[in-house]
């Protein structure tokens, strides 16, 4: 029985064929093989190009390292002018001996681009250094300002403590001498509101407050300690009442806290 001929127009035959129409995606295995082959070709081309560059460089370096012979017209002319092989250039013989190396440009950038790029990098580095220095200076200045503020704050606390101590001593010593009213309202510690209403007139208080507000803590301390030393021969830092001026002059270091440190 004769085999039936295939019907090339049948759906079964057409569906069995691979669809290779333009624009249709290839099977995954075929695509991978194709990409692998392309990468292999590219690698071979790059290797050949690299080998060619290496060969050219080797030949160039070999030629450049060879000394010029007498057959070279330029070298022969130098010899006629008195130059000897291996001699340094210049009248004094202190010039270069080796030729200036040849710098082969392989990039696509224009002439002067590398120099400009190098200069730009140096400028950026210098700018970065300046910023670092400025930041360091600002940080040091901020630290100094903070230390000064803390020092001023501690100093103000100490001055207020010394003033309070002086006010209490003044009230006690004035009382021992039957002085019932302080020379200035702030010479003594502040009384509570009830005592103040009973002891002082409102207008007088307002005038004294104005004077008090004009004085700093340091100024008040200087005035009050001077009063205590002159009126009562008392030093708050020594904590001593002296017998007379001579006794105070001989035994008290001075009229400030620093003198007693």
From Swiss-Prot:
Q: Which GO terms describe its molecular function?
A: nucleic acid binding
InterPro entries per UniProt: DUF4187, G_patch_dom, GPATCH11
Query: What are the Acidic residues biased-composition ranges?
Result: 194-213
Record-given protein name: G patch domain-containing protein 11
Task: Tell me the organism.
Answer: Xenopus tropicalis (Western clawed frog)
- For whether the record's keyword set contains Coiled coil, the answer is yes
Provide this UniProt record's keywords sorted from A to Z: Centromere, Chromosome, Coiled coil, Kinetochore
Location of region: Disordered: 1-67, 88-124, 184-213
Task: State the similarity comment.
Answer: Belongs to the GPATCH11 family.
Chain ranges of the G-patch domain: 70-116
Quote the biased-composition stretches of kind Basic and acidic residues, using this chain's numbering.
29-64, 111-124
Give compartment(s): Chromosome, Centromere, Kinetochore
The taxonomic lineage of its organism, from the top, reads: Eukaryota, Metazoa, Chordata, Craniata, Vertebrata
Q: Where do the coiled-coil regions begin and end?
A: 31-65, 190-222
**What PROSITE patterns does the database record attribute to this sequence?**
G_PATCH (PS50174)
Q: A single GO CC term, please?
A: kinetochore
Q: Which Pfam families match?
A: DUF4187 (PF13821), G-patch (PF01585)
């Amino acid at each position: 029985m004769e085999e039936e001929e295939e019907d090339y127009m049948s759906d079964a035959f057409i569906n069995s064929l691979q669809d290779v129409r333009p624009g249709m995606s290839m099977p995954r295995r075929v695509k991978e093989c194709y990409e692998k082959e392309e990468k292999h070709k590219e690698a071979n081309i790059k290797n050949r190009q690299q080998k060619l560059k290496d060969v050219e460089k080797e030949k160039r370096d070999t030629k450049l390292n060879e000394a010029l012979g007498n057959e070279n017209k330029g070298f022969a002319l130098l010899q006629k002018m008195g130059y000897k092989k291996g001699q340094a250039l210049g009248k004094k013989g202190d010039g270069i001996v080796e030729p200036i190396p040849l710098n082969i440009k392989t990039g696509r950038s224009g002439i002067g681009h590398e120099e400009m790029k190098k200069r730009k990098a140096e400028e950026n580095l210098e700018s970065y250094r300046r910023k670092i220095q400025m930041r360091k200076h600002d940080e040091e200045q901020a630290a100094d300002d903070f230390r000064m503020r803390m020092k001023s704050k501690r100093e103000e606390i100490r001055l207020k403590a010394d003033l309070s101590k002086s006010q209490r001593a003044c009230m006690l010593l004035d009382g021992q001498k039957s002085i019932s009213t302080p020379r200035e309202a702030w010479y003594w510690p502040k009384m509570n509101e009830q005592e103040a209403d009973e002891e002082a007139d409102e207008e007088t208080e307002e005038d004294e407050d104005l004077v008090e507000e004009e004085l700093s803590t340091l100024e008040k301390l200087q005035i009050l300690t001077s009063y205590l030393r002159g009126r009562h021969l008392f030093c708050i830092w020594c904590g001593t009442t002296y017998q007379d001026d001579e006794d105070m002059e001989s035994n008290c270091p001075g009229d400030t806290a620093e003198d007693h440190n």
